[in-house]
């Protein structure tokens, strides 16, 4: 194994060698027979972790990897390597010393993507506290005068709410799951925008503000995007926002047969935009790890998403629309695939989604008459759940804001 995320998952360890993704730089050899070997800087392991792992695993320093591979190759061993994730140097050592190679996708990718009950419980807990932090942030933002907050200060404030909320709810914010995308006005139209002091701009009256952010907690990883109006929103912004919202809802509410792939569902998030001659130039959704990488495969919801969606997989649902030089819109929730109620009169097993993210969607940007009855019912039910789950953890000011933000359409 050469992917640190897979190694972290297989051995149930985490680290902090890099920002945003809690793994340690490491390698591993998994044998068909015999104990696995883990190659990791042992200074990164506490004594209790060393003692526990040593019962099942041979632990080496990373510098020992080439020597161990050489010994195995000299015994004519056959190695399975993921060609997309392994260095050419490893392949060369194996071949030069008499070993053979079988190209195989990382065997941990699929089981890692199918979350077990403990991982799903942790993800729900992580999203519960994340939802409270998001409500506190958007409540605070609604009370600020336009142009008194900028992209950097907004992102910093959101992180502080996450850290404070986690402590109040008996947890800890370990890290962000990626650098926050905090884009006001035309900056929101840059899909992977990263604010810096040179590009930082205020949140101005009459503009849209797009914030795509996520957190790493010990029990789960979050990723959420909301687009809100700063002051009054124009008619074109409302129209485009509602088209994006329709796609997000239609995918969230989908029921589909077993064997369905991500590419089979991608159109649900786009069809409303297509009817208006619009689209977005990115995938609709990606897999998400369990206190691991915020982008995780093999599942995606995209035009190239060939992996079957299986119960327990977490995927993002994030359609958008971006008008260059003017505004950007994206609405993102995380979903988990789960068995769905049978269709009355049907005769096949169906799957659907549970929404994990618990944060209001800006009602001020919705053209209600563009929604179908089913879409309106879905959003009202979602907002009722957001209110129920978040309200007990909010003070009076934030709770009153949430009551307004989640009023039925």
Question: Which role fits each region the language model picked out?
Answer:
Residues 1-409:
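Active-site neighborhoods and metal-handling regions in enzymes and metal-associated proteins
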């Amino acid at each position: 194994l050469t992917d640190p995320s897979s190694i972290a998952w297989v051995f149930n360890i985490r680290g902090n060698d890099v920002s945003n993704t809690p793994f340690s730089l490491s390698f591993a050899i998994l044998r068909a027979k015999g104990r696995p070997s883990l190659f990791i800087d042992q200074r990164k392991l506490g004594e209790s972790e060393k003692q526990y792992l040593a019962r099942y695993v041979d632990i080496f320093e990373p510098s020992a990897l080439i020597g161990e591979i050489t010994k195995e190759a000299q015994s004519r061993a056959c190695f399975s390597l993921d060609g997309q994730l392994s260095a050419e140097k490893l392949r060369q050592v194996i071949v030069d010393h008499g070993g053979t190679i079988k190209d195989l996708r990382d065997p941990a990718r699929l089981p890692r993507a199918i979350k077990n009950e403990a991982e799903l419980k942790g993800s729900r807990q992580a999203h519960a506290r994340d939802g409270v932090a998001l409500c506190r942030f958007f409540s605070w933002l609604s009370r600020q005068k336009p142009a008194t907050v900028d992209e950097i200060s907004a992102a910093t404030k959101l992180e502080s709410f996450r850290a404070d909320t986690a402590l109040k709810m008996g947890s800890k914010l370990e890290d962000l799951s990626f650098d926050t995308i905090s884009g006001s006005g035309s900056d929101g139209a840059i899909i992977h925008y990263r604010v810096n002091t040179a590009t930082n701009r205020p949140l101005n009256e009459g503009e849209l503000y797009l914030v795509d952010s996520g957190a790493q907690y010990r029990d789960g990883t979050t990723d959420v995007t909301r687009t809100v109006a700063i002051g009054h929103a124009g008619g074109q912004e409302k129209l485009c926002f509602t088209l994006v919202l329709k796609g997000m809802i239609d995918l969230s509410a989908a029921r589909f047969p077993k064997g369905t792939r991500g590419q089979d569902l991608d159109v649900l998030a786009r069809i409303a935009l297509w009817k208006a001659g619009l689209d977005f130039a990115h995938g609709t959704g990606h897999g998400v790890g369990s206190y691991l990488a915020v982008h995780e495969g093999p599942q995606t919801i995209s035009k190239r998403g060939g992996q079957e969606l299986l119960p327990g997989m977490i995927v993002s649902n994030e359609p958008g629309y971006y008008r260059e030089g003017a505004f950007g819109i994206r609405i993102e929730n995380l979903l988990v695939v789960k068995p769905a109620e049978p269709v009355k009169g049907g005769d096949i097993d169906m799957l659907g989604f549970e929404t994990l993210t618990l944060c209001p969607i800006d009602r001020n940007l919705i053209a209600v008459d563009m929604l179908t009855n089913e879409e309106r019912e879905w959003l009202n039910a979602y907002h009722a759940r957001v209110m129920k789950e978040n309200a007990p953890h909010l003070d009076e000011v934030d709770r009153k804001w949430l009551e307004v933000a989640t009023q039925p359409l």
